[in-house]
């Protein structure tokens, strides 16, 4: 949630003089909803929030699209990192809908909702994916209109042409470190792994 990003937001603001927007994802913090959308539906909210930020900060001095000075970094941690990567693939005809987004920073994001849930079933409960994960996936599709396989940061980063910084510590037990490597490999240049 947004509170978790306060320290990073502070650094962006104080050290780099960036304006910051720290929204809560659906079902977290002060956001509405009771169920996490695991980044998939949240990616569309983030795109709307970037529009709002552009209206607040970029149109202050002019209404001309060409002369706006808004430049944005989309940065997320864990599920927020997966959301960041899911946002990164939202392109139409090779163009980003939000030309003011300049780069992405993902810190410990997962490859896909399916992979994350499958890993947690095994790590926490020593259970296989079938039948529980398959059933939960079907229920999610019925209730929320998306499924765990569709919600793939891995597929989204393949479409990303903007710079992305990948951060993943080897002590992370919730999102396994191995997930950063296929994500990094799938992302076209420019990219960096830290």
Model-derived segments and spans:
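Conserved alpha/beta-hydrolase
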Residues: 9-32
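Short beta-strand/loop motif that positions the catalytic acidic residue
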Residues: 159-161, 166-168, 172
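Hydrolase active-site cap/lid region
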Residues: 86-149, 155
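Alpha/beta-hydrolase fold nucleophile elbow
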Residues: 59-78
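Catalytic histidine neighborhood in serine/cysteine hydrolases
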Residues: 184-194
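The serine-hydrolase catalytic nucleophile loop
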Residues: 1-11, 178
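Short alpha-helix in the alpha/beta-hydrolase fold that links the catalytic acid
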Residues: 153, 162, 176-185
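Alpha/beta-hydrolase active-site loop
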Residues: 36-63
